[in-house]
Amino acid sequence: MVIYHLFGNVLPGGYLGVDVFFVLSGFLITSLLLREFVYSRTISLKNFWIRRVRRIAPAAISTLVICAAIAGVIGGDVNVNLGRQFWSSALFVNNWVQIAHSQSYFAQSELPIFAHYWSLSVEEQFYIIWPLIVSLLLVILRKTPRLIGKLALLGAVVSALAMAIIVDPGHDATRVYYGTDTHAFGLLIGAALASITISSSTEKRGDTWGYREGLLQHGRILSLLAIPALAVQIFYFFWLGDQDTFTYRGGLISSSLIVAIIIASVVRNNGPVAAIFRNKVLRHLGFISFSLYLWHVPANLFIVTLFQDYEWGRKKWITGLIAIVISLVAAELSFRFIETPIRRYGFIESTRKLSYAIFGERSTSRQRFGGAMVPAAMILCCVFAGLAIHNTSHGTALESELERLQAENRSERSAVKPAPKVVTHDVPKDGTNINAIGDSVMLASQAELQKRFPGIDINAEVSRHYQAAPAIIADLKAQDALRQFVFLGFGTNGQAFPGQLDEIIKSIGPKHTIVIAMPYGDRWYMQDAQQQVVDAAKKYPNVYAADWCAYADDHVSELASDEIHPRGNATVGYTNAFVAALKQWASGKKDVPPICPPAA
């Protein structure tokens, strides 16, 4: 997950790390519940939930508070919607709140600092509902643990089917990826695995898992199966893209089943795969992995925000490496001084020990000072976090700038002038014979387009899709204001619907020269949107592609923080892409560019 979030396409299937964690969590939690029932014939939900709070809350809440405080100090885009992010994460409903606000998990350049808390929310919701179901069946209805396994498998199948049915190929998959209903199968597969590996010993201090019974008695078979299972899982990490249809219609659940095989082999502690996971470094990374996961996203965003004006601060591999170092240090400190004491002694006893370190008769001056610094730092973080949440902004600096440009654009085009009757056969020197229709990327380049083509008619707005173009073109035609050259700048907010771009081109007509910008960005649909421009330029003699994508890909450091919108010199690059396309038209030599970056 860390590599996936910080280094983009280096590990396309890195998001599967969450599903590994889901299967493992479902397995461990259900093992605890079943083991307690086997030796005591009851399940203490109160004690179970107290243990979960002790395990999860210290790291989760401390990271929230500290990072919210840092975000408040840094300010800017990391502070956007901080209150909503904070409270939805603290209450473990982050996934549903993000779904409600149409936040895309797969638009990595706009990932909020607490977006990754979605998986923690799914787990916590499972930790509330699943123990109730297990307790009802085992304690009240007196069913067997094997029935729990069958029910878990049934639930996993239903959840996976829901994901496969609801997912809409070619559209953002965040809904099914974030949804507890559609992404619970990993947790349930882990639960099913627990039901067939749990020990039947009635001794309280007996083994949790039965190594000579159930599934685990087949140690040699498990060790042999684990080798290809691990190989396939590694292959998935490098191959299974987050927008592939197969991912949501078999990929994620098959990965979860593979992980279950690996876990069974590791628990049986037999074979080469189990030996790999006995490595001391991997074991320690496992201990701090929870905090590492919580810290890596905000740490990276803080680094990017603080140093985005430096050239090195725009290079993902540099900021990513720095973020990993910071996250490892923060995770280690959290594990040693926050998570472990509270997990061992509880909140009250940990507070008592801290108080003794400060005020106890045997405490040294150094211990008192160190002990006093902890609550002082906690109070300070809470104050700054509260101020940051209270002063949260509801839009990024880029969004505010685009709103300003949009207001200017609307006022400037209040009166549309009729198109000139003179037809030029060379690259136009001004914009009196050019209409430009587009989205926020064109809007961000408005000033440079007007500078290069004085008199150009620009109609660009934020969040605009191809869907808005037909009505605008019809309106221009009705006013006799559709000019010889028409610039189209779409694709940022989605590819055209089937046949939509053809409809737009035909409505403009073959007597007009159409130049379409090749869109750029990290959105899941971007390559499809680019391919549509390429296909249109090849299909229609009067359509040319403005290769904005190639320029943006070579000058990412010149883009805004979202790495989509141009700023400064990049607006010149955007404008020059249209100029280059017009030169192709004037020379009669069309050169249709490929999509960028190249399809894998």
What is each model feature region?
Residues 484-487, 513:
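Structural motif
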Residues 23, 437-438, 517:
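Short hydrophobic segments within beta-strands
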Residues 505-531:
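Active-site segments of SGNH/GDSL-like serine hydrolases
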Residues 487-491, 518-519:
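Cell-envelope and extracellular/periplasmic
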Residues 18, 438, 488, 546:
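Active-site flanking residues adjacent to catalytic metal/cofactor-binding acidic residues
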